[in-house]
UniProtKB/Swiss-Prot annotation:
Chief place of localization: cytoplasm
Protein name as it appears in the record: Proteasome subunit alpha type-2
Taxonomic lineage from the root: Eukaryota, Discoba, Euglenozoa, Kinetoplastea, Metakinetoplastina
InterPro entries in UniProt: Ntn_hydrolases_N, Proteasome_alpha, Proteasome_alpha-type, Proteasome_asu_N, Proteasome_sua/b
NCBIfam families, A to Z: PRK03996.1
GO biological process annotation, one example: ubiquitin-dependent protein catabolic process
Protein location: Cytoplasm; Nucleus
Assigned protein family: Belongs to the peptidase T1A family.
Keywords: Cytoplasm, Nucleus, Proteasome
PROSITE patterns (UniProt xref): PROTEASOME_ALPHA_1, PROTEASOME_ALPHA_2
Amino acid sequence: MSESSYGLTTFSPSGRLVQIEYATTAASKGTTALGVKATDGVVIAAEKKTTSPLADSLTLHKVFALDDHVGCTYSGIGPDCRVLVDAARRACQRYRLTYHEPMPISQLVRQISFLFQEFTQSGGVRPFGCSLLVAGADSRGNHLYQLDPSGTFWTWKATSIGKGSPDARTFLEKRYTNEMEIEDAVHTALLTLKEGFDGRMTAENTQVGRVVEGRFELLTVEQLKDYLDQI
């Protein structure tokens, strides 16, 4: 293989950074995660997949709180995501200590994207093999962002990442409306996950977080069971 296939900072003759493409492929092979923005909040949901039926699924996390007003989920390599989650949490803490208010979501996303991008042009490292969905609320309203290994980010009304992303996005395009409220958004997120779920969908192998009234919360197993009984 050519040097450009291995070198992180070497462009191929066609103008591609191949290692970033490999990282994007790794992110796309992870379990499905998705986000839905409502008029009064944001929902993010993800499939949890253990490597063995003997593993305790409650110790596996796919949705994380970053601060009181923001959380995220991911698809791809779990340890890579944890590095980004820790960095995002530190950024939120520093902002609170400095300005005595929650960090704006757009500013947090830019900070995370800088870290993503830094690992695409430095020697001795590799790109992060995961994509993130960030959901939060600030003085400008509710927000849903997607970040990719290249450091690129976008805002979305509804989107998905992971191996089931194409089918999930098609389902969301058919079901999403601009008037959707948070309860319907939770149902839509779970129905979308269920469409491409690998096996039986339960409260133990699914995780959901939502932003309601400016605060981010993780749904409990009991809350998830109630929602799953309704779909």
